[in-house]
Structure formats: structure tokens, C-alpha cells
Amino acid sequence: LDVSGNLEAGIPMCPPEGDAGTGMTATNSVKVRTGNVSAGTSVFAMVVLEKELKKVHPEIDLVTTPAGDLVGMVHCNNCTSDLNAWVNLFKEFMESMGMEVDMNRLFGVLYNKALEGDKDCGGLLAYNYFSGEHITGFEEGRPLFVRRPDDKFNLANFMRTHLYTSLGALKTGLDILFREEQVKLDVLLGHGGLFKTKGVGQKIMAAAAGVPVEVMETAGEGGAWGAALLASYRVWKEDGETL
């Protein structure tokens, strides 16, 4: 790894990892009845449990917080990939019109437009499966958008539909935790790309999960911020100081 020979033995290394333990740290959701959700190209929610689950659920992974408390995790392969593909289609249209595209502004305009849509998304229906989805039993991905001739097909409902479907598989797993297992959750902290546009992903997630969702200013950085915090704890913690 080190052809120069300058690295010394014993240097702390941060292993490449997703937003699991780092996400819990980034959002400070390591206490019982708190949770965090990382939403981007894939999505997962982690809920710190008060007690063990009644039975085994294939949809729920059991892990722990960095401090060792039991966590119920719902992980889904698909979240915003299909949504991002549609946003890129709008980007391509704008470029074809000779316009310069600011992607942050484009996402902001389209995401906020979704808040103007009908509660039932005007009858529009989408499935965001870019890849297989174990929670719902799909081995391969087939993104799909369908509508009836008399549905209310407009931009607001179109974007609202794709934002909601990005969390459809996640809701399937969360319903097992909240309804079957009666898990209690006071707050869910959001991080990842879905939450970069202020307020929109937060509202969609709250509706899907049925619990209050909060977003920190570092939401877009997610696991990277958590990794930095854990590294700081590793280097500068005092004797006996817990996470």
C-alpha cells in the first residue's frame, strides 16, 4: 500500500463504510427511541430499540450503535436513482434549449413543485426499482411509470409520485417495526442527498414513516461528517469517556 515507505505502524485507519454507524453518529441518534435515515441512491433507516424484537423478520437487520445498543435496520436497494434519472431528463431538455443548468436549483425547483401536488398524486403510479429489491421480492430492477387517461398528469403530481415511491420499500420495512413490533420512535434524523433540498424530503419522509423527521445542517454530508466525528473521538477521547 505504501511504496514510499513513509507510513508508520499503528496509524488509525477508517475502513470504507456506508452511512450505518457513521450516520448514527452524524445525526447523534444513538439513544433509545431515536433513529436516523440515510436516503440517496439507496436508503436505510436505523431505529435504536428499547427491547428485542418478538420474532425474526427477513426485512429487518439487527445491528448495534457504536456504543453497543440494539438497532433495527431497514435497508433498501432503491431510493433516488430513478428520480435522479428523471431530473437529468429535465437537465437535458434545458441544455437543448441553450440554457445553463444549476443542478442545485433544478433539484430545488422540481422537489418544491412536488409539494403543490395532490395528496393522492393525481392517481399517478411509479415503481423506482433500478435494481432488485429484497424487501418486496424483486430479483431485478424495472423502473416503471404508469397513469390512466383521466389521471391528473402534471409536473407537481409527477414529482410527488416519484418522491413518494423512492420511499415505498422503506415504508414496508418500517411498518413491520412500528405496527407489528410496536416499536416506539420519538424522532427520525434525516441525512443524505434526498434531504439537500430544504424541507421537501423531510416532509415526504415524515409522511412515509409516520413520525417527526428532523434534518441537520450537515444532512448532505451524512456519513462523511459522522466519520470525522468518530475519528475525532478516537484520537482525542479522554480515559473512560464514552461515545
Region roles according to the model:
Residues 2-189, 194-243:
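Active-site core segments that coordinate phosphate-bearing ligands/cofactors
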